[in-house]
C-alpha cells in the first residue's frame, strides 16, 4: 500500500482543485486540510484499489459540511489564471475563465461536481459513482444533464 505521505504528495493538488470546483473560494484550502486530517485518521481502513475516489469523497463531504455551515464564498482568484505573456492574453484568459466559472456555477452542485470530476479530473464513471455515492447510471444521467444545460446556457450567451 502507498504511504500516506506519498499519496498526499501525489494527490494534494487534485483534492484542492476539486474543493475549489465545489466551493469556488479560498476556503477550499481550509476544507482540504480538514479532509487530509480525516484521511490520515482513516488511512488504515482505506481500500488501496480505490484511494483516489476515497479521498475525493472525503473532500466532497468536507465541502458540503462547509456549505451547510454557510461559511463558503465564491471568488475568482488571480492564482487560478494560467501564466500568459501579453496583457491582452491575460484579459482574454480572465474573461474565458470567468465565463466558464459563471456557467459552472449555474449548474446544480451534483451536476457541476459530476462534470468537473469527468472532464477536469478525468475520473471514470465508476470512480465518480464512488465519490458521489450514487449508481453509475445516476452519474451518466448527471453528466448528460450537465452537458445539455451547459450547452443551452452557452447558446443563450452567444445569442446575446
Cite the ranges covered by each PLM segment.
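Short, charged helix-capping/linker segments at alpha-helix termini
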Residues: 1-6, 16-34, 42-49, 158
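Acidic, proline/glycine-rich intrinsically disordered inter-domain spacer in sigma factors
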Residues: 2, 73-74, 78-105
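C-terminal flanking helix
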Residues: 12, 16, 36, 108, ...
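DNA-recognition helix of helix-turn-helix
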Residues: 60, 126, 132-157
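A short pre-motif secondary-structure segment
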Residues: 114-118
Amino acid at each position: 500500500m502507498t504511504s500516506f505521505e506519498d499519496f498526499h504528495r501525489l494527490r494534494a493538488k487534485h483534492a484542492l482543485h476539486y474543493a475549489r470546483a465545489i466551493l469556488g473560494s479560498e476556503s477550499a484550502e481550509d476544507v482540504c486540510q480538514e479532509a487530509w486530517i480525516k484521511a490520515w485518521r482513516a488511512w488504515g481502513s482505506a481500500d488501496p484499489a480505490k484511494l483516489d475516489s476515497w479521498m475525493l469523497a472525503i473532500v466532497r463531504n468536507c465541502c458540503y459540511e462547509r456549505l451547510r455551515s454557510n461559511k463558503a464564498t465564491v471568488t475568482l482568484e488571480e492564482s487560478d489564471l494560467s501564466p500568459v505573456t501579453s496583457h491582452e492574453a491575460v484579459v482574454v484568459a480572465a474573461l474565458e475563465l470567468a465565463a466558464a466559472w459563471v456557467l459552472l456555477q449555474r449548474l446544480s452542485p451534483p451536476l457541476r461536481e459530476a462534470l468537473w470530476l469527468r472532464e477536469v479530473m478525468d475520473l471514470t464513471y465508476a470512480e465518480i459513482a464512488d465519490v458521489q455515492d450514487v449508481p453509475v447510471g445516476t452519474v451518466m444521467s448527471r453528466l448528460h444533464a450537465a452537458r445539455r444545460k451547459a450547452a443551452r446556457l452557452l447558446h443563450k450567451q452567444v445569442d446575446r
